[in-house]
Design a protein with these regions (language model features):
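Ser/Thr-glycine-rich phosphate-binding loops at phosphate-binding pockets of nucleotides
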Residues: 108-112, 168, 192-193, 277-279
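Gly/Ser/Thr-rich phosphate-binding loop
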Residues: 12, 16-20, 51-55, 59, ...
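Alpha-helix/helix-capping structural signal
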Residues: 59-62, 86-87, 91, 150-151, ...
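Active-site loops of AMP-binding adenylate-forming
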Residues: 109-127, 150-154, 158-159, 234-236
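Conserved AMP-binding/adenylation subdomain of ANL enzymes
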Residues: 2-53, 58-62, 67
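Conserved ATP/PPi-binding loop(s) of AMP-dependent carboxylate-activating enzymes
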Residues: 128-134, 141-165, 179, 196-198
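Conserved C-terminal "lid"/linker of ANL adenylate-forming enzymes
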Residues: 215-218, 250-317
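AMP-binding/adenylate-forming catalytic core of the ANL superfamily
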Residues: 146-148, 171-263, 268-273
Length: 317
């Protein structure tokens, strides 16, 4: 209940609907420390309380989907699982549907009273965060989403204008049917050495849907190719198996967004180590700084490999 989303979506909406609210302890859900999750404990908790609805982060959804794909039985009481707080790949939504999980992706921000958009039964589009709710109006300017309507009063000690649209900092577009699509954060967008814009969240969401990768941060600013710093679900995974996993992910990406190589993280990214925010998002600069030597070594290792311009010069010769 420390987040506005859980208060608005999990508490207030349920109370207004005359629903029962269950708030298990973190231990009962299966959490341990800042990043540990015991999935069987989580599933046992779901069976014990048989909820009809819950709000999940993409990482929790992936854990449930992977468990179900391996034969774990999930409760049939679930009717609406809202997922948000990070980019959710279309493949993960499809996998959730295939194992019978009623997942609906949404989008929001605290400045705009939490939930802004939501897919709903009968109004769902894969790859989108749904249509805006009645209290919000969403527009796009220079690729960035702006929101008008009900909003917060401001931050303590910080004057915030209550007039005009809120610049979300999120990149995206609205399709012809009014569904909003998010591609990443403006401040995280990087430009490769060949002038291609890449939203790292998009590439990371593809990596994290593969069972080999537990955490990943993609880097390619002013570089000839992209790399990812990743913590593997099995840190002992061999190089050949890791290469095969990366190749499988890259097949779903255009050439400019593909990841050339993986830098193995030296430890799980955690809030306690300063590598995650309080809501579980990666602190990119801190992760890059911690692995700077390994990143430079990775780029140096591939420095002699031909790249696009090398092939172009060979063709012209």
């Amino acid at each position: 209940l420390s987040t506005l989303l859980e208060n608005v979506g999990g508490l207030y909406a349920a109370l207004l609907s005359d629903a029962e609210i269950v708030v298990p302890s973190l231990g009962e859900i299966g959490y341990s420390g800042s990043a540990g999750l015991d999935v069987p404990t989580l599933i046992a908790c779901l069976h014990r309380h048989r909820p009809e609805s819950a709000i999940l982060l993409p990482q929790l959804l992936l854990a449930l989907v992977m468990a179900a794909e391996r034969g774990a039985a999930l409760p049939d009481s679930l009717k609406f699982l809202a997922v948000g707080g990070g980019r959710v790949g279309e493949t993960l939504i499809a996998r959730a549907g295939a194992v019978g999980l009623p997942v609906f992706e949404g989008y929001g921000l605290s400045e705009c009273a939490s939930v802004v958009c939501l897919n709903r039964p009968g109004a769902t589009r894969a790859g989108s965060v749904g249509r805006p709710l009645q209290h919000a109006r969403v527009s796009v300017r220079d690729g960035e989403l702006f929101v008008e309507g009900v909003r917060m009063l401001g931050y303590l000690g910080d004057e915030v204008s209550r007039h005009g649209p809120v610049a979300t900092g999120d990149l995206g577009h609205i399709d012809d049917d009014g569904f909003v699509h998010i591609t990443g954060r403006r401040k995280h967008l990087f430009i490769t050495a060949f002038g291609r814009n890449v939203s790292p969240e998009w590439v990371e969401s593809e990596l994290l849907q593969h069972p080999a990768f537990a955490q990943a941060v993609v880097h390619g600013e002013a570089r000839p190719f992209n790399i990812a710093i990743a913590w593997l679900r099995d840190p002992a995974l061999g190089d050949e198996a890791l290469r095969a996993a990366l190749d499988a992910v890259n097949r779903a990406l255009p050439d400019y967004a593909r990841v050339r190589d993986i830098v193995r993280a030296d430890a799980l990214f955690t809030f306690a180590d300063g590598l995650l925010t309080s809501n579980g998002r990666p602190r990119r600069d801190a992760i890059l700084a911690r692995h700077a030597d390994a990143v430079e070594a990775c780029y140096a290792r591939h420095a002699s490999e031909p790249i696009f311009f090398d092939h172009l010069q060979e063709s012209a010769a």
